[in-house]
């Protein structure tokens, strides 16, 4: 069989086309302290400096062996663009949202008139361009963003789930706004060199909102992004945290190329329940990748591969203290696997 470049290999794998072997990629957060030390680009500075962001993302390839580069390393830049307060994080902890900006319909005015060139969103686009210019012919360039449901929750804060259950008008208004932003942001990522988009939508979890609410308040807004990317022939992967087993068939309706699943999801059940997307996952990022040994990683990888996972990957974002040796073993297991 033809030997493909990493870029060609992932393109084909996400579309269920034959490939020579499994791509070794990660669609969730990739940075670790050991990569920071090797590259000289550290958190929290790398969250807010395009050159450092690109340098640290590059370390996922040069240090670990991932056959793609991915930015950013958190899911708060979008909320920050709209005025939410952000705790910057530190060497080991990612940034987090600590202040929300929309309480009612009148507050929606605060969100208008944004520019994708401003703030960390603009820096992420710049980092994508840097990575694309260096690696774009050979490696997949993955642009990652928070999904519309979780972005709306970041903007609305603790009131979000209450508003959801009481059917407040702020809910569809925010979801329309956020998904329109997501589409514009994804298109800007592609314009700057991204060829694959990862949508991270943790609070849209089946465990939190159930199937009925997911189908009403998450599915159509995620699908809006996917449809826009399909028009550009850009692959999409959706990651939602928690045990999403019972919601996977609904998630598949988004039309994404890949569904990234949490370590609590049974891979065999997932592959049986999902008709269109490939299943991505789902090594435990804490018990196996952070606290395990390379031997543990190899054993866990074999179990996941044996039941037919589409792409071997962590079940969630990589913990910053994860040893490089464990991630390198995961990469090795993926590269050695032929479908």
Swiss-Prot record:
Coiled coil ranges: none
Gene Ontology molecular functions: [methyl-Co(III) methylamine-specific corrinoid protein]:coenzyme M methyltransferase activity; dimethylamine methyltransferase activity; metal ion binding; uroporphyrinogen decarboxylase activity
Catalytic activity, EC: 2.1.1.247
InterPro entries: Methanogen_methyltrans, Methylcob_mtaseMtbA, Mtase_MtaA_CmuA, UROD/MetE-like_sf, Uroporphyrinogen_deCOase
SUPFAM superfamilies: UROD/MetE-like
Cofactors, names only: Zn(2+)
Catalyzed chemical reaction(s): methyl-Co(III)-[methylamine-specific corrinoid protein] + coenzyme M = Co(I)-[methylamine-specific corrinoid protein] + methyl-coenzyme M + H(+)
GO biological process: methane biosynthetic process from dimethylamine; methylation; one-carbon metabolic process; porphyrin-containing compound biosynthetic process
PANTHER family: METHYLCOBAMIDE:COM METHYLTRANSFERASE MTBA
Protein function: Methyltransferase involved in methanogenesis from methylamines methanol pathway. Catalyzes the transfer of the methyl group from the methylated corrinoid protein MtmC (MtmC1 or MtmC2) to coenzyme M, forming the substrate for coenzyme-B sulfoethylthiotransferase.
Protein name per Swiss-Prot or TrEMBL: Methylcobamide:CoM methyltransferase MtbA
Naturally occurring in which organism (per UniProt): Methanosarcina acetivorans (strain ATCC 35395 / DSM 2834 / JCM 12185 / C2A)
Gene that encodes the chain: mtbA
């Amino acid at each position: 069989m033809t030997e493909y470049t990493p870029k060609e290999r992932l393109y084909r794998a996400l579309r269920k086309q034959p490939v020579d072997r499994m791509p070794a990629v990660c669609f969730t957060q990739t940075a670790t302290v050991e990569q920071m030390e090797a590259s000289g680009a550290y958190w929290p500075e790398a969250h807010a400096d395009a050159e450092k962001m690109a340098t640290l993302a590059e370390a996922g390839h040069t240090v670990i062996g991932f056959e793609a580069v991915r930015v950013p390393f958190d899911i708060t830049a979008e909320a920050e663009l709209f005025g939410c307060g952000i705790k910057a994080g530190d060497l080991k902890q990612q940034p987090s949202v600590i202040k929300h900006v929309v309480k009612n319909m009148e507050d929606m005015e605060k969100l208008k008139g944004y520019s994708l060139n401003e703030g960390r969103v603009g820096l992420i686009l710049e980092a994508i361009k840097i990575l694309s210019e260096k690696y774009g012919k050979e490696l997949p360039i993955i642009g990652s963003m928070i999904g519309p449901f979780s972005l709306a929750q970041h903007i609305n804060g603790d009131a979000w789930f209450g508003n959801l259950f009481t059917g407040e008008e702020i809910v569809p208004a925010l979801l329309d706004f956020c998904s329109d932003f997501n589409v514009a942001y994804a298109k800007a990522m592609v314009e700057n060199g991204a060829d694959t988009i990862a949508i991270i939508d943790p609070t849209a979890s089946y465990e939190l909102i159930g199937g009925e609410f997911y189908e009403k308040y998450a599915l159509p807004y995620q699908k809006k992004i996917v449809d826009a990317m399909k028009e550009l022939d850009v692959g999409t992967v959706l990651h939602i945290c928690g045990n999403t087993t019972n919601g996977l068939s609904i998630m598949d309706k988004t039309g994404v190329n890949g569904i990234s699943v949490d370590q609590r999801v049974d891979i065999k059940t997932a592959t049986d329940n999902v008709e269109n997307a490939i299943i991505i996952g789902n090594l435990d990022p804490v018990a196996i990748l952070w606290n395990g040994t390379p031997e543990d990683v190899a054993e866990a990888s074999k179990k996941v591969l044996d039941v037919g996972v589409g792409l071997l990957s962590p079940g969630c974002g990589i913990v910053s203290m994860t040893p490089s040796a464990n991630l390198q073993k995961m990469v090795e297991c993926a590269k050695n696997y032929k479908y």
